[in-house]
């Protein structure tokens, strides 16, 4: 809908005006308005629609007013002027009824339904609007069905789209009325109609159905299904150039990521949505809402960080509670744990982490029971019910709400009874028991009235109003209730105003509750909870406060509007419904951390220890500062802890309000003994800022100044004669993540922190220590032993790090200088990457969370540094970085020498390649270019062809997953000539690509003398293309062909394999995964073993292999002529018998080293004896292949933490759902048979001596079975002493020392 269309329509309008043709004049005015409307220019569109309307009213008959009324109603709706929209839409309907025009009546009813629906979404309590929307949508559906079955004469469309859109609108309405199951049914029916009627794949009607199904499955917590439908919606809108719909799709996807705590992904989606929204002229409301939602996500990230801190606090307090058993401090410790759990419950609800919420609520229930406090226990029952309610397990939520009511009734707590009754009503409403729900709400109202609790009365009345209006359709009763609700609100506001006037001078009364938050989710999004829970930490921290009465203030419930934050897509996209995400309250920073890290430099001549430059015997106290903690910081998630110090603990215990920040004790520091903190550098470990350092008030033995979350301060620097650094680790979380794989990451982290804290004069030398080994208790630690030491120790741990020399890291020094000059915080991830770099000219900063701004210091440093390889992959870099790279290479004195640029998985657009075209020095230097997984689109076609044509040194090009089509592939083919040095080309996963463009490309590649590797995975190849492929694969130089998921079939695969291996002197790599291969393919390979004599790596995963094919494959592996070194058979439906056959065949095989047999035996069908492996996790021990089981936590907690995003995952109810130990998940095989299979597998595995990597993931093996298999793996003579394993949940990797079983992304693997 470009400017040319508008100009042409305006010319036609002026021409009609000149000749006086009023009908044509009105038609063209409407046409101009429609073009402008679709372009997002609503104000200008309104002007032209008004011209159309004025002409039609003055000069044309009544029937000609129908289209102009419809257009005006539509544009006013998009401008959110509902009053004007309704005027013209009702006039449209009136005219249609007068003319007895069924088509126009259907359109008018649809528009009226949409307008009333939008009014409902924008209003606070407009139940009449939703009823009107329901009436008009149902009428539109009936009319659409009539038109579909009996279309009017002369109408050829059949009104299929209108009928499908009617299903969409009804489904959207059901969703907004909290009927997601009904919505799913009708929306699925709409998709079914699309399929039956063969509606185009990329059709707007499908887009709207997928959009709303995404919302439905989000409401049902079916995250995978929701994502699938949302991505389909986005894809369709992108294909049909529906910018507004694509933006709304990205908003939906962002909401999904936010609800599953994937905040980085959510921000990325909002960024895309914002770019799309800003491209439309009059969508400022949409842009503002996206910006608002982005802020909410950032607040959620902060809350999640706080939650993780408080988890550490809980761990510490739980340990203290255990230690205090049987002492006078026991109850006090229990109250502190209870208060901490309350805070965790609040924060988990803020970020929709309902599985965690359930975990904490059950622990709160348990500890409330131990406290013998019936009120706290009844409140805890209510919180457990809230968890189940939000996890959509309504039967269980009802059970706990009823128990809460019974508990509060037993102690005569009226507020608790009222809230429990309201929550019971919510649960009954969710399962369709509307009469029971109404009775529960009315009972809750009577109790609240009796207890004189106006806020709870209001909440109950609103729920009663909801039931009468929306469930029973009793408009008269609903109207009476609305008046009662309004009167109650007015009286409550008056009372609050009076109270605030009386209390405005009461400083002491308000101080204790100054920071009590009333931002707990209300009844519209989660069950009601007593306000006593919000102030619980006040009561819990002092036993004297145990009997504090419940606070009566409660936010009124709004169950009716709990879906309002979700925008639906209607039959024609009209406006962007603002999503009122629950604003995450800025909660007080709660600090945590059981242990902390201190690095102590020892001096041979003195035993004085320096902690932050403070002598051990000093007695000064340093002010505490607030801290922001990174959720991904490896070592410093628990930065400071109020309870680390007895004096502070006492203040917390004795104070009347733990929400009021403690005032720091101001004591003048001993300046002669403490160095200034002004030179400290805060390390931005995850792109967020860290503030200052933290020093705790000392204990009775002297002051212990401690570092904050992001800092380890070195105020004394010396290279001691024994070249050792003493490390006292006080926080087990510090090193657990780093050392869970090996101890090298621990060494690297400590080294980088050491360097950061050096004085400037030492730092300027760029010298960093090389930590040779870590020692503990006089012995050298073996790999991963630090993990066990930290886990098992209840006290501080002192580790000695032996320094084995010093290494000069020039680029690190340059980077730090540029950070200082640009006022940017250094990135810890980037520093670690630079430190471990072995080749100075090879710069690998992949996965450092770099953005254009944070990458600037590195690019600045590279101006005075030579580059042979630059890896910026897996970051968030955009075209701005590419422009700086062009300037970097253009200004560099390095005019010659090979250059590798790895830029995959970023945010580069098509013009990023333009920067390469504008840099002549790259024409001579660039040898490897990887820009895969960037949204380049066909707009980069001319740039890409220029690069291929002019970069004569280029031998490797990767443009996979770049949204390219035939046009770009054809341009690349045209740019190739016989002089090109291209050797490797990856174009996979780009669609659609036509057969002719692929054939042209293959023909050009066949003329290249040195072409060796081609990847076309994910591109569907026709039989004609396969024929063209034979000529290329016969070329002697070709050594790697990847055509997975290409659909070439068995015959094509046989011909390709024959051609590829034809007279090949060198080995080749072949990927035929997911190609629909039949058993005849494997039989052919077995019959002509020369076909596989040249294959080094062979991927046939994803092809279902029958018993006949398995036998042939087994025979092939036994043949000594087979040279296959790597074989992938994942997802081949081998089953246990097939696994056994393949492994048994390896006893005589001398070549196969890597075998992937994952996803072949379904867990539900063939779980081998004992518990499934996912119920326990096993930690890898690298000492002689032994394995140490990690102590399992409580079953509830373990299941809760397994996956916060699993659909329908719930924690076992400890009281009525005991988990059975040692039961198998299936009985499809008898136990003796299962034991026999494992025994045979073990025997075969011990004889497969050549094998070095074996992947058995997702095959349903139990812990006992895997233990048996691993014993056989490690007992093999070729693997004795070097056997390793990685077993966690369903991941099962057996390997040998020196091999990497996993960890490298598929897109980053280099041959």
UniProtKB/Swiss-Prot annotation:
TPR repeats at which positions? Answer: 26-59, 66-99, 106-147, 164-197, 207-240, 247-280, 378-411, 418-451
Q: Which SUPFAM superfamilies match?
A: RNI-like, TPR-like
Biased composition annotated in UniProt, kind: Polar residues: 515-533
Induction conditions? Under cell cycle-dependent control with a peak of expression at the S phase.
Example GO biological process: response to DNA damage checkpoint signaling
**Which portions of the sequence form the region Disordered?**
492-533
Q: What do the Gene Ontology cellular component annotations say?
A: chromosome; nucleoplasm; nucleus
Q: Name one GO molecular function term.
A: histone binding
What is the purpose of this protein?
Histone reader involved in homologous recombination-mediated repair of double-strand breaks (DSBs) at stalled or collapsed replication forks. Specifically recognizes and binds histone H3.1 lacking methylation at 'Lys-27' (H3K27me1). Involved in structural and functional stabilization of chromatin; represents a link between response to DNA damage and epigenetic gene silencing. Required for cell arrangement in root and shoot apical meristems. May be involved, when interacting with TSA1, in the organization of spindle microtubules.
List the protein's name: Protein TONSOKU
Lineage of the species this protein comes from? Eukaryota, Viridiplantae, Streptophyta, Embryophyta, Tracheophyta
